[in-house]
C-alpha cells in the first residue's frame, strides 16, 4: 500500500538552488524512493510566473512520487501542514551593502517565516535553513516559532562538510566514501572549522596518513572556507547544484538515518563544547529514527579551541546584531 504523501515546503522556489533541488525531491532523493511528496513552493509575487515555469517542467518529468504541487506567495499557505521546510530563499548581499543591513533584511524574512511555521506547520516539521547567513537565519526562525521544538530548526553545514571530504580524499588518495568521522564546527561562513583529527579512511587515521600541520592550517582550512568565493570567481555564479545536493544529504540523513556515521549539521546548542545555548552551531551528529544526536565528549585541543571560539565570536556578533528585531 502506498504511503501517505509528505508535504515539503521550499522557499525561494524560482531561484537557482531550488531549480537544482526540486527535481531531485520529486524523484525521491530526499525522503526515499517509496515516499510520495507534495511540493509547496513559496516565492515573491513577482517570481510567481517563473515558479509556474518550473512546475511545468516538473509536470513534464511525470515523476511517479510527485503527488501534488502548491504555488504561493503566502508563507501560511506554503507551510501548511509541512513535514519538511527547506528555507532556501534569502536576501542576497548587494553591492555596497553592509553586513548589518543584510542581517536586518533577512531578519524580516525569517521572523515572518518562523511565525508562519509556528502557526501552520506540522509540530514535527524538520526545518533546514539554506539561505545565508544560514545559522543566524535559522536562529531567527527558531526564536520566532516559540511553540515548535527548538530541535526542529537546523542550518546547512553539509556543503562545507562535503567540500572538506572532497579535499581530504584528494590529499590522502583515499575514496571519498571511505572517509568517516569528519567534523565541521561553527558558522556556515569562511570562519568555520573543518576538523579531521578524528577522521579515518578505510579504518586508518587520516591525521597520521596526511601528517601535515602546515597543509591543514594554510591550505585545507582556507580552501574549504573560501570555496564558495572560488566558485563565484570561476563560474560567475554562486554554487547552486552543490548546495542543493548538500540540502538533500542533510534532510535525507536526518529523516532516514546515517547508520552510525558522523555528518555535520548546524543545530541549536545545548551548552556543550563551550557554545552558549540556542546558538545554531555546526557540530558532528549521528542521525537515527528521524532524530539527530550530537557526538559528545570529543577532546578539543588548543588549536581547535581557538578556531571554534573564532567562529563562535562571529555567530555571537550576528545574534547581537538581530536581537532588537526579535520579540523573545
UniProtKB/Swiss-Prot annotation:
NAD(+) binds at residues 12-18, 106, 113, 130-132. InterPro entries: L-lactate/malate_DH, Lactate/malate_DH_C, Lactate/malate_DH_N, Lactate_DH/Glyco_Ohase_4_C, Malate_DH_type2, NAD(P)-bd_dom_sf. It is an enzyme of class 1 (oxidoreductase). The keyword Oxidoreductase applies. The keyword Lyase does not apply. Its EC number is 1.1.1.37. GO terms for biological process: malate metabolic process; tricarboxylic acid cycle. GO terms for molecular function: L-malate dehydrogenase (NAD+) activity. It catalyses: (S)-malate + NAD(+) = oxaloacetate + NADH + H(+). Substrate binds at residues 93, 99, 132, 163. It comes from the Bacteria. The active site is at 188 (proton acceptor). Keywords: NAD, Oxidoreductase, Tricarboxylic acid cycle. NCBIfam families: MalateDH-SF1 (TIGR01759), PRK05442.1 (NF003916). Catalyzes the reversible oxidation of malate to oxaloacetate. Belongs to the LDH/MDH superfamily. MDH type 2 family. HAMAP family: Malate_dehydrog_2. This is Malate dehydrogenase. It comes from Burkholderia ambifaria (strain ATCC BAA-244 / DSM 16087 / CCUG 44356 / LMG 19182 / AMMD). The lineage of its organism: Bacteria, Pseudomonadati, Pseudomonadota, Betaproteobacteria, Burkholderiales.
Amino acid at each position: 500500500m502506498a504511503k501517505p504523501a509528505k508535504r515539503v515546503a521550499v522557499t525561494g522556489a524560482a531561484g537557482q538552488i531550488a531549480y537544482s533541488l526540486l527535481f531531485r525531491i520529486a524523484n525521491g532523493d530526499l525522503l526515499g524512493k517509496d515516499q510520495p511528496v507534495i511540493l509547496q513552493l513559496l516565492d515573491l509575487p513577482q517570481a510567481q510566473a517563473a515558479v509556474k515555469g518550473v512546475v511545468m517542467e516538473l509536470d513534464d518529468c511525470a515523476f511517479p512520487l510527485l503527488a501534488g504541487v502548491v504555488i504561493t506567495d503566502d508563507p501560511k499557505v506554503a507551510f501548511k501542514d509541512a513535514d519538511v521546510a527547506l528555507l532556501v530563499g534569502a536576501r542576497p548581499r548587494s553591492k555596497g551593502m553592509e553586513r548589518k543591513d543584510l542581517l536586518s533584511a533577512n531578519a524580516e524574512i525569517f521572523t515572518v517565516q518562523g511565525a508562519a511555521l509556528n502557526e501552520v506547520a506540522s509540530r514535527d516539521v524538520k526545518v533546514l535553513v539554506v539561505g545565508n547567513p544560514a545559522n543566524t537565519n535559522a536562529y531567527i526562525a527558531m526564536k520566532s516559532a516559540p511553540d515548535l521544538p527548538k530541535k526542529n530548526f537546523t542550518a546547512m553545514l553539509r556543503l562545507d562538510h562535503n567540500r572538506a571530504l572532497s579535499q581530504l580524499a584528494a590529499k590522502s588518495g583515499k575514496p571519498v566514501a571511505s572517509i568517516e568521522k569528519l567534523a565541521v564546527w561553527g558558522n556556515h561562513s569562511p570562519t568555520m572549522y573543518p576538523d579531521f583529527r578524528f577522521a579515518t579512511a578505510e579504518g586508518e587515521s587520516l591525521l597520521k596518513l596526511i601528517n601535515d600541520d602546515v597543509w591543514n592550517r594554510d591550505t585545507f582550512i582556507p580552501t574549504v572556507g573560501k570555496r564558495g568565493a572560488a566558485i563565484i570567481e570561476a563560474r560567475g555564479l554562486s554554487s547552486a547544484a552543490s548546495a542543493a545536493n548538500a540540502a538533500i544529504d542533510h534532510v535525507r540523513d536526518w529523516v532516514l538515518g546515517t547508520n552510525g556515521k558522523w555528518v555535520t549539521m548546524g543545530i541549536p546548542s545545548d551548552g556543550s563544547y563551550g557554545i552558549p545555548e540556542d546558538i545554531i552551531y555546526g557540530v558532528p551528529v549521528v542521525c537515527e529514527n528521524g532524530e539527530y544526536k550530537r557526538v559528545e565528549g570529543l577532546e578539543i585541543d588548543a588549536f581547535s579551541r581557538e578556531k571554534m571560539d573564532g567562529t563562535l565570536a562571529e555567530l555571537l556578533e550576528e545574534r547581537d546584531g538581530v536581537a532588537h528585531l526579535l520579540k523573545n
